[in-house]
From Swiss-Prot:
This is CTP synthase. NCBIfam families: PRK05380.1 (NF003792), PyrG (TIGR00337). Mg(2+) binds at residues 72, 141. Residues 1-267 are annotated as: Amidoligase domain. The active site is at 381 (nucleophile), 518, 520. The lineage of its organism: Bacteria, Pseudomonadati, Thermodesulfobacteriota, Desulfovibrionia, Desulfovibrionales. Keywords: ATP-binding, Glutamine amidotransferase, Ligase, Magnesium, Metal-binding, Nucleotide-binding, Pyrimidine biosynthesis. HAMAP family: PyrG (MF_01227). One of its GO terms (molecular function) is glutaminase activity. UTP binds at residues 14, 188-193, 224. Pathway: Pyrimidine metabolism; CTP biosynthesis via de novo pathway; CTP from UDP: step 2/2.
Amino acid sequence: MKTKFIFITGGVLSSLGKGLAAASVGALLKARGLKVTIQKLDPYINVDPGTMNPFQHGEVYVTDDGAETDLDLGHYERYLAEPMSQKNNYTSGSIYHRVITKERRGDYLGGTVQVIPHVTDEIKNAVLSLAEDDPDVALIEIGGTVGDIEGLPFLEAIRQLRGDLGKDRCLYIHLTLVPYLRAAGEHKTKPTQHSVKELRSIGIQPDIILCRCEEAITADLKRKIALFCNVDQDAVFSAVDVKNIYEVPLRFYEEGFDQKIAIMLRLPAKNPNLEPWETLVDTCAHPQGRVTIGIVGKYVDLKEAYKSLHEALVHGGVANKVAVDLKYVNSEEITEENVAEALKGLDGILVPGGFGYRGVEGKILTIRYARENRVPFFGICLGMQCAVIEFARNVMGLEDANSEEFNELSKNKVIYLMTEWFDHRRQAVERRDSSSDKGGTMRLGSYPCVVVPDTKAHDAYGVKHIDERHRHRFEFNKAYFDAMAQSGMVFSGLSPDGELVEIVELPDHPWFLGCQFHPEFKSNPMQPHPLFREFIRAAKTHPAGKR
């Protein structure tokens, strides 16, 4: 079967949940036995989100091949349990970069380079590249909102693709808002009508309309939307607000959403096996206990900055049959005077990754509190580096211990800038210095790690060799390896050549572990990551009330 393409657009306003909708449809089609992939096309001019402020963009999601991508790729991987790659996320910046590179190389033979056909052709090439892996279905999410000027080339490209591929291989789904006005006591369809009108003016007639709403819309409203938007009544579906995002595939299935897609694209009509999803949702709905985890960072005002962390902690809760309540703590506000009060009642503390000095001292105070008060602690990326700094200062007595990132004049730079390493394929040496560009210049992607036996890390993984995803410029300074080991720090994960420290832990603590990589990027609800599973287990076993 030739690959079928499903294009998902959004209207009225942003943040309606196109990524979750795409991931949920993908999960349903995969449950039917189909091979599925998903792509995100982002209209912004940045080449990738790697240098974007988390407060503006949210989390940067890293794939195995080192691509810095939109957080929606995290949804795709978690719902499909399939790895994404660079080809699953393109931006206007990356598309234009390709076009300009070709123009400079002379590929256009002196022709005038224009949005149509050159930019739109490059977008189409990006979409069609998904077919190289022979999926049965490829879902393509168009970022932004219909009507945004920067999204026009992408909409024009997917309009052309229906003509290129044929109607039997393309399907357009439009996600829109149907607000409920409590004062009037009714849903309003006018925003949807105008959104579809805008889409049709571009040349795209949606085949299915998905209505984001607080409560399911009635049959009468579906008839009205179908009439004004020129679709079949049975092609109008509700996307109702849910308490747990993992309910969405089940809600779509109850609506017959995947069945309609299968009929319209003439896909094999095998009934989906949704038992794993039903079990997952039931486990979340009926926990056998609760734990409270504090996430101490500086991006806490935008929860999307820690999206994969949030989900990985939920997965850890599922593995332990407990609900995970999250408390976000701003590390910039933590002082020696208030640290105990700020962290009171937490069953576990997690210090996530980040960049820059702002908020770091609050993280270090947090880690000292967790170490001294035997609170289960998990440090990720910068969180691990801060744990090393805290240990050097307060256990080894190196009062000026710091990271080269924060204080280049420190005499004890226990964390320093990596200047040379193999790429994630181990095929080439990467070299950087302090003057290198910021974008795409970190140690990125999946790298192997050797886990030391008889450690908490090995107890969690159960194997010696693992692969985890990285996103960092700074690394543990091996000059302090022996001194720290003699002071009680255990280096439980190393690169295969032994040169890079990947995991640290304290053996005389209920659970104190830091890792240089980002394990949250490899967790999904059906297979919770081992470190998150064990972290939540420790929080459950050593709750605040028993310490």
